[in-house]
């Protein structure tokens, strides 16, 4: 369903987003 798609997208994006957020902190 839609949530499983969003979950897959989130798993792919998180590794890229987390370092960016960490740098800003």
From Swiss-Prot:
It is found in: Secreted. Belongs to the frog skin active peptide (FSAP) family. Caerin subfamily. Shows significant activity against Gram-positive organisms, but is less effective against Gram-negative organisms. One of its GO terms (cellular component) is extracellular region. The keyword Transcription does not apply. One of its GO terms (biological process) is defense response to bacterium. The keyword Secreted applies. Keywords: Amidation, Amphibian defense peptide, Antibiotic, Antimicrobial, Secreted. The modification Leucine amide is found at residue 25. This is Caerin-1.18. Transmembrane segments: none annotated. It comes from the Eukaryota. InterPro entries: Caerin_1 (IPR010000). Expressed by the skin dorsal glands.
